[in-house]
Amino acid sequence: MKPMGRREFLELAAAGVAGAAGLPVLGGCRKSRPGMAEAGGLDVAAAPSSVADAAPPAARETGYFVENFGIDEATLRRTIAEGLSRGGDYAEVFLQHKTADGIVFEDGQVIDASVRVDLGAGVRVLLGDQTGYAFTEDLTPEALRAAARTAAAIAAAGVRAAPERLVRRRPEPLYPQQPLWLPVAPAEKRSIVDRVGRKLAAGDPAVIKASVRFRAEDDVVLIANSDGVLVEERRPMTFLYATCTAERNGRRETNWFSRSRRGGPEFYTDDLLDRIAAEAVRRTLLLFDATAPEPGEMPVVLAPATSGILLHEAMGHGFEADFNRKGISIFASRMGRPVAREFVTIVDSGLERDHRGALAIDDEGTPGRRTVLVEKGRLVSYLHDRISARHYGVEPTGNGRREDFRFPPLPRMRVTFMEPGPHAPEEVIASVKKGLYAVDFSNGEVTIGAGDYSFYVKTGFRIEDGRLTAPVKDVNVIGNGPDSLSKIEMVAGDFELDGGTWTCGKNGQSVPVGLGLPTVKVSAINVGGVRR
């Protein structure tokens, strides 16, 4: 049997999934980015179709990429050596094979279904703070070395030897390490979507439109680098996003609810599917009774779980080390100094088992860990990738992340949250004479340098005389992240991690994240009018 080319492999692999599913196939797209080079080609590949077709090594290696594509340790070491051949002080290979299938259901029928296969490698070479990067969608040894030569062009100061051997790490699994979605019958995936769609449509006579988006991924990555590290893991992911539109007296409202997890079909119990539909309907109908509060500066109480988006966006990005290394973040000169009250502790963790933002290893091969950013009100750490950790003389925190093999890693959040505090939720609300209780947020903007933010509260409630009263919607809240952090007056003990479909964008890259919060009182935020 002759080796299959990459294009042939993609067509056969995707057809195998979609043929069973009766779904159209979308192959992996080519997406070049400014400042990045693509090496190799799409048409020529020599990846063996099975391990049996490859010449067996003296000591048989195991692992996904050696068994399926013939990329053994020797190939990885030669690629790393090529990356170091012009004077770089670090080289890294990132391999990825991801199959993702999606279904879009609208008004009682599937309107779109697809399978996408991404397969490729990125090679990065560092020289101090400088980065050379190239990617290829061809996994032959020749194409990998060509990508390494392209990435190595940034350096020309001699040759550093590649490691004599790579030591395979086996990270403690935080999510299942076997294929979860490829074996699932198409009818089972369709039934998940059908159930939510039916429940949405039947949720209330006012519902006029029901939409469901479903996605399931089986993703495998491998990282090998010039420090001798070799690590490989599976990263399952799924989400279901339900949108409801209702109409009353000629007025329409739309809202949504979603759940996501690093898991398989067992995640979608009947109870969860029914809850997703019911919540989307409930949140939509609530908007018919919502009004706009009076504008002005007032206390804002952030509800548990979903309000963590404000922490993530308005404050979390300011803790990412690249922004601090470059002097962009307002926190760049505040390490070790108080930034909040003593009952405020903020954490970013990759260890939240099965959570959307969990990572047993980051995209540089650093093991996942729990990083305390603000401890008892004092800033104690940034979020580091390898480059920023070098700059600050600290260990990487496991936050080097990338969208896929086409991109170099950056410091990114994983699951970011505030720990529980000493107050009772009822006590927090009772302390407010007149203010806003913010529940769900929609789109917003953040200026990383100054930390200024503007967000829309999709749903919330007025606080009047220490009680929650009338619902409000689409209210603009405007503030400054560091200022709001310093104005946190109370933190309750009712901490929740949110299980929604959160995706964070930075420098053109999107990655899945998680967030959470207990009930939190900020003494003053500027509240604007209803968005038109």
Q: Which residues are covered by each model-predicted region?
A:
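N-terminal small-residue-enriched
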Residues: 2-532
